[in-house]
Structure formats: C-alpha cells, structure tokens
Amino acid sequence: MEAQTLYEKLWSSHVVHQEADGTALIYIDRHLVHEVTSPQAFEGLKLAGRKPWRISSIVATADHNIPTDHWEMGIQDPVSRQQVETLDANIREVGSLAYFPFKDQRQGIIHVIGPENGTTLPGMTVVCGDSHTSTHGAFACLAHGIGTSEVEHVMATQCLLQKKSKTMLIKVEGTLGRGVTAKDVVLAIIGRIGTAGGTGYAIEFGGSAIRSLSMEGRMTVCNMAIEAGARAGLVAVDETTIDYLKDKPFAPKGPQWDAAVAYWRTLKSDDGATFDTVVELDATSILPQVTWGTSPEMVTTVDGRVPDPAAIADPVKREGVERALKYMGLAPNTPISEIAVDQVFIGSCTNSRIEDLREAAAVVKGRSKAASVRRVLVVPGSGLVKHQAEAEGLDKVFIEAGFEWREPGCSMCLAMNADRLEPGERCASTSNRNFEGRQGAGGRTHLVSPAMAAAAAVTGHFTDVRTLN
C-alpha cells in the first residue's frame, strides 16, 4: 500500500463521493456551532422544512458576543442579546450532543470547550462557522472553518463539498529555549512563510519541538495555521494526545476506549509519505516574538526593530510596510522594547487555556501592573479553565497585580462585545489577528505569547520575558 500523509488518511476516510474534476463530498463528524454564524442557517432549515441530519454531531455554545463581566446584568447590547437568545431557542428546539449556554459553568470559547470535553476526537472531520476551527487539528482532526451557507449545508446533509488540498510539512527540530512558547513558534513560522505561504495547503506540524509541546501548545500552533493561509493544521497522534483525552466526559469509555486508541495510533504520516512542500525550522533559533504591523507575518523578535520601508526594494512590500507603520503609529527602526502599551489582553481561542494562564501568572507573581498601562484583561477560555485557575490561586496572582479577572468568552480578540480598544490605544494581545480595527476601531494590536503579554503588563512596554524570570 502506498505511503500516505496524515491529511491523505483523514481525507480518504471521509470521501462520500468524488467528481471527475476533483470536487468531493466529505462527511462531517463534528459540527461546532456558536451564536454569530448559525442563526441564518437554522432559519434556512426552517424555511425549507428541514431538520438537522444528525443532531448528535452538534456541539454549541455562545462565545463571541457575550460580556466577560457583570454577568448578573445579562447582555446589554440588543443585537448581541438577540443572537445569543436565538441560538438558545434554536438548540433547544432541534437538540444537540452538547450545549453550553451563557452562564453555564462549562460555557466558553467553542475551540476551548470542544477539546476539553472530549467532543473533539482524533480522526474526525470538524467544522464550525469560525476561521480558527483549525485549532482542532492538534488532535489529528481534519478541521477548518466554513461560511454561513455551508453551516446550513452541513446541518441539512452532514456533508460538505470540498477540493483536496496540497500537503505541507513544517518540521521544527531541536529544543525550544527558555521563555520560548508555542505562540512564538507559530509566529516565527508565519514570519518565515508569510500569510499566503500555506494557501492551498493542509499543514502538518512535526519535528521534535512540536512533539515536545503539550496539547495546549499544539492547539495554539494549529489555531494560527489559518493565519499562514492554510486550509487546516495538523499534528499526529502520540501519547500526549491520548493522555489528554483519557477520562474526558465525551471520550469513549471501556472497550470502546481501547478500540479508539488502537485506531488513533494509526493517525500519523507513514514513513516514506511524500509532501508537496517541506519547510524546516531550527527550534533553537526561535526567540520570543512580537508583531509590529497589521498582519501576523509582520513579526520580529523582541530584541529586534520595526523595519525601515526605505530599505525594502519591492515597491509593493514597501508600500504595505509604510501603511502598516502609519496605522500602528510607529517610526522606522524603533526598537521593539521601546514600544509602550496601553492595554494588555490575555485570552482568546489561541491562548486562554490553563497552561497559558500558568505561564502568565508565573511572570506576574510578586509584581504589579505598570502605572502607564490602563487595563489588563485576563479572560479564561472556559468555565472549566476558570475553575481550575481559581483552584490553583492564579486568579489571586492576577488580581493582586491589578489585573482584571473575567468570565470566559472571546472578549477582546475581536470587537464584537464590550471588551475593546479605544482609537489609538496599543495592546499586547495573546490573540491571533492584528488586522486594522480587529480589537476596536483605530486600535493597534501586537500579537505575543501569554508570558510576553504579562511582561508587557508589568513593565509598560514590550520586554524580553527571559530578563524577568
């Protein structure tokens, strides 16, 4: 039998029908649903007189629009409140495998609660009306975002029309240095291949540095595969994967667990499998990263400088850098360490899991928020993460430092709720996108790891976290 990549195994095992032009009908195992991209889909089903094909595939929660403080006051914004109430009504009418409504102790960001509850399992196809569904590829799932019309299509048919992607292997070999995290790894990768480098590809992340990451770290890497232009990000199953899933509420039990694990162990690229493209990075060369512009590929090391457009020969790239620097309010050649921040956000589906909060708390402990920093938000990714963090006393570390400890939700990752930047404010953020206006009109976003965000919070500017430990 011909050697196959992990992507090819996942693809071939889910093809229902294939056309001569390569278009295929793919079966979907898990459908993640939230309040923003689902109302139109449910309405379309009702108008057509249809019901969801397999409600046991649906896992739903409210995350984008919900507030992260003063839950006793409910949702103040009328549009946000309507979306959340509509999701609640739709799910209660049609049913689901699992639904974690607003204020439920297990509620949280959809890409956090899926894995932590065991509803994301290796070998699945996973879709959601959300770009960062690629997160679930950390479990050797074929996972990607879909549009609202496709949300309805999946609900109605349990299938999706797709074309097969090319395959890319990104190998990160070696040992990561002190203070270097999964977020730094994926930002370094995007800095290397660019935001279009993965276009048309499913990226498998491999190498000793990737294998050394926890599942939380692997989710961070796969979460941002979409920011490299990829359709999906993947990591092969190993003992780390299996240990994480054991005893999760929706994971198989007893003999079914044993059978599942036996299958999961096959979910890796075969020896001799051929990738369309291979990229290699030396883990020892990766340093803490900070983005300086309005795209994740506009990134450098914490000891670096903002680029000088005058030194860029390509006129298109030069113009792009000039525009980014103007929006970000930065002068060419400014040292990254001299850039002051107004707010800090520790959260999002990229970096709001327990490991992320531990990393930030380790930096913050015994220190205080810099007087020049207006606000620091720490937003756990789910109620379960929040509960665990509080059991470990992490909330007290943040509160004593002058940070705000919030309820779970998407929060300041995107300006769809009350947590946002004011025009001109600069934020050190653990989220995944630094586009213009992403965190609020006129807001300026710099992407960093939780540890680096914590360092900026206590010093008032971007600081090499390795100098604080």
Curated annotation (Swiss-Prot):
Under the subunit heading, UniProt states: Heterodimer of LeuC and LeuD.
What is one Pfam family matched by this protein?
Answer: Aconitase
Q: Which reaction does it catalyse?
A: (2R,3S)-3-isopropylmalate = (2S)-2-isopropylmalate
The task this protein performs is described as: Catalyzes the isomerization between 2-isopropylmalate and 3-isopropylmalate, via the formation of 2-isopropylmaleate.
Q: In which pathway does it act?
A: Amino-acid biosynthesis; L-leucine biosynthesis; L-leucine from 3-methyl-2-oxobutanoate: step 2/4
Any one GO molecular-function label of the UniProt entry: 3-isopropylmalate dehydratase activity
Cofactors demanded by this protein:
[4Fe-4S] cluster
The protein's matches in PANTHER family, at most eight in alphabetical order, are given as: 3-ISOPROPYLMALATE DEHYDRATASE, HOMOACONITASE, MITOCHONDRIAL-RELATED
Q: Which gene encodes it?
A: leuC
Q: Where does [4Fe-4S] cluster bind?
A: C349, C410, C413
Cofactor notes: Binds 1 [4Fe-4S] cluster per subunit.
Give the UniProt family note.
Belongs to the aconitase/IPM isomerase family. LeuC type 1 subfamily.
**GO BP terms, alphabetized:** L-leucine biosynthetic process
EC assignment: 4.2.1.33
Q: What is this protein called?
A: 3-isopropylmalate dehydratase large subunit
Principal EC category: lyase
Keywords from the named record:
4Fe-4S, Amino-acid biosynthesis, Branched-chain amino acid biosynthesis, Iron, Iron-sulfur, Leucine biosynthesis, Lyase, Metal-binding
Q: Entry's NCBIfam families?
A: leuC, PRK05478.1, PRK12466.1
Cross-referenced HAMAP family, in alphabetical order? LeuC_type1
